[in-house]
Amino acid sequence: LNRQKTLELGATLNPIRPLNIAISAYSGKEPAPLPTSANSGTRTSINATASFNINDAISVGGEVLNVTQDVPVGGGATNSVKYNGVAGYGSFMFTSKIRGALRVENFDDKDGFHFGTPGTKYREVTATGAYLAADSFEARVEARRDQGTNAVFRQYNGALSKSLMTIALQGLYKF
């Protein structure tokens, strides 16, 4: 249970009609990441996304993420751990009811802060097909492949692998 205070700042900008920019920052005390049992340290997350509608059918976007945390190491000293990522995506409306999207992400967890295995870089590719059945309902099928430089993904048999493939069926109701 974390009862510490967190500061959150955010801004959404729409400087021209087809461009949307969102920036957010969070900072506050969080429990130290595993495998340590150290006390809480200050975690700071900065995220920026931008999307641009090229026309009614095509949109592109990008995202940048940077997260750091100070981990107490004793005697009042701290060690800073971090991870960061960058992503790009695009979507295309094939018809008024069918949309496709592709997302590519690179993620660097060099300190093992997020996934627990230091020195690991990740690449993820997601392809999404969507059927817009109504203004309030969307059906999706999504295929995602994750690839790491180290074996960090647990397989069905318990062994670790450098890659992971997932498929999802989704129904989204908008209200």
Where on the chain are the PLM-derived regions?
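Outer-membrane beta-barrel pore domains
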Residues: 13-15, 19-175
